[in-house]
Amino acid sequence: MKVTQEKLPASQIGLEIEITPEITKQTYEQVIKNLASTANIPGFRRGKVPRPILLQRLGTTRIKAAALEELIQDGIEQAVKQEAIPAIGQPQLRSSFEDLINNYEPGKPLTILAAVDVEPEVNLVQYTDLLFQAEEVKYDPEQVDSSLEKERQELATLIPVEGRSAQIGDIAVVDFKGSFAKAEGEDETAELEPIPGAEATDFQVELQEDKFIPGFISGIVGMNPEETREIAAQFPDPYANEDLAGKAATFIVTLKELKEKELPEINDDFAQEISDFETLEELRASLVERYQKEADDKTKTNKQEALLTELLKHVEVDLPLTLVEQEVDAMLTQTAMRLSQQGLDVRKLFTQDIIPQLRERSRTEAIERIKRSLSLREVGKRESIEVTPEEIGVRVKELLEQYPEEKEVDEDRLRSIVENELLTEKTIDWLLEHSSVELVPEGSLSPAEETEAAESDADADVSQTEQENSEPSTTEVTEG
């Protein structure tokens, strides 16, 4: 079989495949033979239909199309194997099938044009002496006090309040019912329209302004037990439930009980109750170490991300569609698994309407992921960065000890995953050693909100769908 190769854009190899007259004839005859043995034509037993009758009944075009399908499939498969092309994904036919049928004559040569995706070539214009900035995350001593105070609040004892009205920090037990406030000029005698889900009995709420929509908590402050009050509140705009965004509301609230928190002292006894440490000093030292490590880890991650972002500016690679689609598939699968573990119904979230949108929104990140992976692999090859079996074994052992409940583990696959992770880590460390990074204060390069938003586009889409498909609840109405 004569095969001519041609380099195409998007990391494709074009193939011009010339199929010999013998094969075009042989395939055609075999198709007729197969059809003759299976065709059900009145007046003839199967396998005994005369050739002219078979051709007349089935039609030459249908028979040629069946033979052509076999020629195309076998021809491309043999060409890829003959030329030892490391193809990825499914080959694509570049010739028009209609033109091939018109040109196909059994016993004469047939030329087929096809294309296959292959691993892309990575051109690293520069990968050493890179210059970039990264945000340095510093340990904040206040984190320790905040952590201890949070634990202290969790251990609070609720004591009934007597002789005073509600104030910020109290725990109130209320009945409430919410309605839409009347618009200006609306009939004062008309009944208020209830807000769906904005009704509760014996609802316990901590009087903290940031936990509910503006006006609700401040309206309760100053109330006495058994008192009923009409409270005006305003839904913020934007708001999770778009139907309520920016709308004014009226709540009829009855304060049934009022309690205050009695907080424990932060001492050695407190430390023993919330941890395995004997003294408060030991607990504080442990928290300092933990938050210091978290800060160092975040700084390290920032340096790695900044490095990879800078590296991609100096990489030239033409990605095949197959790799991009495979990465998009993997990303959506990971998102679905994560949402399923959170108890969400993935079938309701990943509808036929939203999947194409998610695929399109995931494409940019998928392309960046692939470029990163290919670039790091190329650096590893050029610099002969390797991982030893001993290093793999140590990491595998750590993982197995970390998850002892996992009984059915494919250790070969686990070792392969670990090898890739270690190789990536080593390559990034090598690049950092051969680059220059300037550490700048946290928050000085880009707002954290933008970073978090960029990382959760897909989750945001499916979460919005979940909101649209669910009934409103008390917390949806009242929480800000």
From Swiss-Prot:
Where does it sit, as one GO cellular component term?
cytoplasm
Q: What Enzyme Commission number(s) does the record list for this chain?
A: 5.2.1.8
Q: Could you say which residues form the signal peptide? A: none
Q: Where is the composition biased (Polar residues)?
A: 462-480
Example GO biological process: cell division
One GO MF annotation is:
ribosome binding
**Keyword rRNA processing belongs to the record:** no
Q: Which domain of life is it from?
A: Bacteria
According to the UniProt entry, the note on domains is: Consists of 3 domains; the N-terminus binds the ribosome, the middle domain has PPIase activity, while the C-terminus has intrinsic chaperone activity on its own.
User: What's this protein's name?
Assistant: Trigger factor
